Amino acid sequence: MKTRTLLLSSLFAAAVAFAQSPAKTNTASASANFPPIGGIHAHVCGIHFYSGDMARQIIAEHYCSHLSDEVLQCVLYDSNKPGARLIGVEYIVSAKVFESLSPEEKKLWHSHNYEVKSGVLTAPGMADAAEKDLMKALIGTYGKTWHMWQVDRGDKLPLGIPQLMMAFTADGQAKANIIAERDKLYGSTAAKKMARADIADAKHDPGADGWQKGVAVQLDLKTVQATAQQLRRSE
């Protein structure tokens, strides 16, 4: 209950900070008639890598809304500027929800403990105290992330099938140039790490971050036989 209350209060603080930002003020009227978009109340920036290929790392801007006190949903963009490309989605669930998932399902999810403690995860534009409260709420959660647009390889369109993404779990995994690029946008990752040193580590479910065991999960495209019902409808 304490964690749930903290998550809700942190999300409220994020909503207030986001609502007061110039970007939100300027676009509020434009999104007023689009309730799902109007429900976005937090902006978080993280760095993902392709499951099975840590060499491919990408900064992702998350714009999030909450479905309940246990589930968040985020749309992901490749920048925070007008004309940004929508590259994916991330679903975030509480530890309680994650524990209820099957072993096979858990392989698709990543933990957020290291992202929070390392400073890799940040909430742009939010006051330091409010951001820290949000990170305390997120540290024990788990994310399931799909990227549909592989902008890192120069694709001009969202080509191919969705790609499962993962998050860092230890020092030395994030590329120095990626961290430097993100630091130019939102301040020192190292400073955030120091400021969060007193945040307690979350209990880690071994079902998440399966790639650490040496076997990563990724999608593959296959051809399936159309059903008789589908064929009849096409006639």
Name these PLM-found stretches.
Residues 1-7:
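Bacterial N-terminal signal peptides that target proteins for export
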Residues 80-166, 170-172:
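An exposed acidic His-Trp-rich patch
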Residues 5, 20-71, 82, 135-235:
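N-terminal domain-onset segments
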Residues 11-19:
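Hydrophobic h-region of N-terminal signal peptides that target proteins for export
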